[in-house]
């Protein structure tokens, strides 16, 4: 059984399934607007990016379906776990993302949630969905590469 990969020090949550389901063409780092109980919950490690996506509306960009579990000590000040969260980007970056997502087949997917100098950031990617045969081809390529690595290792 393979060992579980360690997260890099600042990484709080990662959407590993996104790289399997989508071809990521471009990535952008964005800030995110969070409430106090949300950041405490994220720092505790209870954020989930699975099935999350971003949408451009009225010149602003929001992340939907990003689950942040309620903070246990937050009592009545707790947040809604699935509320849309605003991303902080420059206007021209939002316009660029908006034009890309208007093309058929493109989506904005959050890839990673991490801390940078004590501030929470989201790495978002402009992605196009993979077809089933694309996924199979990627798995075959990965297996071939692994076999080549094994052969090279045995050689030396």
Swiss-Prot record:
Record-annotated disulphide pairs: none
Keywords per UniProt: Cytoplasm, RNA-binding
PANTHER family according to UniProt: SSRA-BINDING PROTEIN, TMRNA-BINDING COMPONENT OF TRANS-TRANSLATION TAGGING COMPLEX
HAMAP family linked to this entry: SmpB
Localization: Cytoplasm
Domain of life according to the entry: Bacteria
Originating gene: smpB
Protein name per UniProt: SsrA-binding protein
Family: Belongs to the SmpB family.
Cellular component terms (Gene Ontology): cytosol
GO terms of molecular function: RNA binding
Function statement: Required for rescue of stalled ribosomes mediated by trans-translation. Binds to transfer-messenger RNA (tmRNA), required for stable association of tmRNA with ribosomes. tmRNA and SmpB together mimic tRNA shape, replacing the anticodon stem-loop with SmpB. tmRNA is encoded by the ssrA gene; the 2 termini fold to resemble tRNA(Ala) and it encodes a 'tag peptide', a short internal open reading frame. During trans-translation Ala-aminoacylated tmRNA acts like a tRNA, entering the A-site of stalled ribosomes, displacing the stalled mRNA.
InterPro entries membership: SmpB (IPR023620), SsrA-bd_prot (IPR000037), SsrA-bd_prot_CS (IPR020081)
Organism: Staphylococcus carnosus (strain TM300)
Any one GO biological process: trans-translation
């Amino acid at each position: 059984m393979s060992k579980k990969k360690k997260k890099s020090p600042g990484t709080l949550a990662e959407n590993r399934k996104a790289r399997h389901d989508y071809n990521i063409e471009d990535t952008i780092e964005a800030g995110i607007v969070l409430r106090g109980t949300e950041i405490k919950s994220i720092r505790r490690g209870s954020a989930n990016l699975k099935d999350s996506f971003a949408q451009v509306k009225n010149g602003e960009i929001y992340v939907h379906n990003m689950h942040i579990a309620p903070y246990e000590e937050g009592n009545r000040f707790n947040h809604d776990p699935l509320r849309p969260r605003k991303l902080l980007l420059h206007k021209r970056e939002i316009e660029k993302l908006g034009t890309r997502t208007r093309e058929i087949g493109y989506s904005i997917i959050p890839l990673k949630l991490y801390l940078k100098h004590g501030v929470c950031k989201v790495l978002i990617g402009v992605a196009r969905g993979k077809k089933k045969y694309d996924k199979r081809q990627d798995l075959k390529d990965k297996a071939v590469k692994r076999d080549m690595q094994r052969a090279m290792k045995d050689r030396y």
